[in-house]
Amino acid sequence: MSTEEKKIILGKVGAVYGIKGWLKIHSFTDETEAILDYFPWSLKLGNNTQTVEITDWRKHNKVLIVKVAGIDDRDEAQALVGSEILTNEAALPELSEDDFYWRDLIGMSVVTNKGYDLGVVTDMMETGANDVLVVKANLKDGFSKKERLIPYLFEQVIESVSIENKQICVDWDPGF
C-alpha cells in the first residue's frame, strides 16, 4: 500500500485580490467557509503540488479570500491562480450510514428496482430542495435518452446505494 494519503479536491484558487498577495477562493464545500476546517492544504497546478499554510482569511462580498504564508505580492499570488485546493481524504468527517459524499456517488451505475440499467452518474447538482443525480444514459438506451436528472431523495426515489458494488438502485421510470 502506498504511503501517500489519498487527496480530495476542496476548491480552486480563483483570482488575485489586491496587491499584498491575497487570493480569492472558490470553495466546493456546502458552506463556503467550511473549506477552512480542512488542513493541511496542498495547491496543485499542473504537475506541481505544494503544501501551504493559510495565515489569515476574510469574507469580502460573499467571496472568501485567504492569505498564504510566504506570498506577499500580487505577482507571487498570480502564480497560484487556477490551482486546485487539496487535502487528505482522512480529514473528512465520517458520515452516517445513509449519507454519502458526492465524489463517492459519481461513477456509480444506476439501475431501476426492475433491473433496467439507466446509466452512470457523471455529476451532481444542488437545487435547494434536494440534490440531483446527473446520469449519462447508455449508448443503447431503449428510450433514446442521453441524460437523466434523478432527484436524490432517499427512500422516495433512491432505494439503496452500494459502495461495494458501485451501484445505486432507484424507483424511477426509465422513460422519464
From Swiss-Prot:
Q: Does the record's keyword annotation contain Coiled coil?
A: no
Kindly state one GO CC term assigned in the UniProt record.
ribosome
Locate the PRC barrel domain: which residues? 97-176
Record bears the keyword Mitochondrion: no
Query: What is this organism's lineage?
Result: Bacteria, Pseudomonadati, Pseudomonadota, Gammaproteobacteria, Alteromonadales
Q: How is the subunit organization of this protein annotated in UniProt?
A: Binds ribosomal protein uS19.
The cross-references to PANTHER family, in alphabetical order and at most eight, read:
RIBOSOME MATURATION FACTOR RIMM
Q: Which organism is it from?
A: Colwellia psychrerythraea (strain 34H / ATCC BAA-681) (Vibrio psychroerythus)
Q: What is the name of this protein?
A: Ribosome maturation factor RimM
What is its subcellular localisation?
Cytoplasm
- Originating gene: rimM
A Pfam family (short name) is PRC
Q: Which domain of life is it from?
A: Bacteria
